[in-house]
């Protein structure tokens, strides 16, 4: 499993903007799962927050968010890879009402061959002559 280390930095150009040091994540093949782990280095003020990772696929679908673990990491699963690309962001919330999010980044997956439909449909008319041949006694 590979790990992508992503640093979230706070910019103060016009108010506070949180941004990832990697703008586009390249996450393996379409429909892959649990191949990559994302590890986030978060700003100091986020260390007391619950941090969730939100994905929006290219089609507009918004899968359930993932909560970062105690190491600020998540496994990339099919929430990300069911479609070739989309956007992502982190959301940090604490009990005192603090809410912050990163500027959305992009992710992309490379095209793969559709393995869900590669099995050939064999109709009875194709295999019947073969099975009868083997059942014939001399």
Where are these regions (language model features)?
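N-terminal assembly/attachment segments of tailed bacteriophage virion structural proteins
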Residues: 1-116
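Charged heptad-repeat coiled-coil "rod" segments that mediate homo-/hetero-oligomerization
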Residues: 118-130
């Amino acid at each position: 499993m590979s790990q992508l280390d992503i640093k979230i930095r706070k910019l103060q150009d016009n108010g506070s903007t949180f941004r990832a040091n990697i703008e586009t994540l390249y996450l393996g093949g379409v429909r892959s799962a649990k191949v990559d782990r994302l590890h986030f280095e978060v700003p100091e003020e986020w260390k007391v927050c619950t941090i969730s990772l939100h994905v929006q696929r290219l089609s507009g679908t918004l899968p359930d968010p993932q909560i970062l673990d105690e190491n600020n990491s998540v496994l990339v699963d099919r929430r990300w890879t069911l479609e070739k690309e989309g956007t992502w962001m982190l959301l940090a919330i604490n009990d005192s009402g603090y809410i912050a999010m990163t500027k959305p980044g992009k992710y992309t997956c490379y095209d793969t061959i559709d393995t869900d439909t590669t099995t050939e449909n064999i109709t009875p008319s194709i295999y019947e002559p073969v099975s009868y041949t083997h059942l014939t006694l001399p």
